[in-house]
Structures are given as C-alpha cells and as structure tokens.
Amino acid sequence: MRALVQRVTSASVRVDGDEVGRITPPAGGHGLLVLVGVTHTDDEAKAALLARKVWTMRILENEQSAADLDAPVLVASQFTLMADTRRGRRPSWSAAAPRPVAEPLVDEFTGALRELGATVETGVFGEHMEISLVNDGPVTLLIDV
C-alpha cells in the first residue's frame, strides 16, 4: 500500500458538488490529508501497518505525531498513486488493485486509524472527488509498506 500524506491546516472533499468530508484542526493546529493507493499484493496486515505509521509519524509541530495531538485525518482513495511512469508518456495503471480488492483495504486502513483513536473523515471510493487543502510547510511524504 502507498500513502501520500500531507500536513494541512484544513482539507475537504466534494463529490458531485456536495461536501462529503472536512477536517478543520483547532486554530494553529494541523491535520493530515492521506491519499491511499492499493496494489494487488496488499492485505489487511499492510493496511493496519500503514495506519499505524501514518498515525504515529512525527511530522506535526514540535516533532509530534497526529496521535500525540489528536489531529484529524481526511482519507481519500487514489489509484493513480500506483502509476508506473517509467516508459513512454502514458502511465500504466496495471499495478493498481481492482475495486473488489482495493475498496475493502482502504476501508480497513480507515477503520484501523479509527481503532487507534483518530477522528477520520473520508472521500467516496471510486468517485470523482474535488479535494481542497491548505498544505502547511509544505510537508508531503510518500509512505510505502
């Protein structure tokens, strides 16, 4: 599994013009926007490992984690994170897991974050989403497990 993690001061996601998720950390605080990609070999153990890594990664103020600060998290699936761009000018999506594999694992990742104590908002799997964010720093990390 792969996660693109961004430290944000706010983030929201809209589907068909309707807001389906929003995080607004307390004034001066941060949250995380996490875009998640799934490949064919991923499983529930990797989803749980990725959730722990994201929740405890010390990328917020004073080298603290989202867990330390109870920072909110917005999660959205993004199959394009699995793109292979090494050849030609057209990305290959063959590494991206199909919906029947990917959707339950994104749900598992989100559930694992909640079990760890995170306040989690989500996008809608497989839908065209408009994501708005204020990236602070900027701080953007790519995490593979």
From Swiss-Prot:
Keywords: Cytoplasm, Hydrolase, RNA-binding, tRNA-binding. It is found in: Cytoplasm. A motif (Gly-cisPro motif, important for rejection of L-amino acids) lies at residues 137-138. Its EC number is 3.1.1.96. GO terms for cellular component: cytoplasm. It is an enzyme of class 3 (hydrolase). One of its GO terms (biological process) is D-amino acid catabolic process. The keyword Hydrolase applies. The keyword Methyltransferase does not apply. One of its GO terms (molecular function) is Gly-tRNA(Ala) deacylase activity. Pfam families: Tyr_Deacylase (PF02580). A Gly-cisPro motif from one monomer fits into the active site of the other monomer to allow specific chiral rejection of L-amino acids. Belongs to the DTD family. Homodimer. This is D-aminoacyl-tRNA deacylase. It comes from Rhodococcus opacus (strain B4). The lineage of its organism: Bacteria, Bacillati, Actinomycetota, Actinomycetes, Mycobacteriales. The gene is dtd.
